[in-house]
């Protein structure tokens, strides 16, 4: 497949994600998908991950800022926003709704095989995300180092 075709698959996936169309994942994600970021395998566990995220952040949206493809890999940078209005499981701990709006930049790397996402990695600033939710706070020393964030 060409780089443009691979980018089109990723765009369709993010569009399906933003529209909460998990059924379309069946056409876009390999049954034996490997999710390195969340250490899981398989399409169904991948879909379950998103279903749980949608419960915690029903308005979560990812806007593509940049997308690059080479060979069978696609890199995409998204600006994600959402409001924590539902219960969300955070590392095995249930986090009740905070009502806080969050935003974060995320980079995904996907390997495409047979016109589907076959393998994926994710890079984001989880520390800042947790700070925005109010789950963690700076220490007094941290507040002095980063007063604009404290």
Residue ranges and their predicted role:
Residues 1-150:
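C-terminal and inter-domain tail/linker signature
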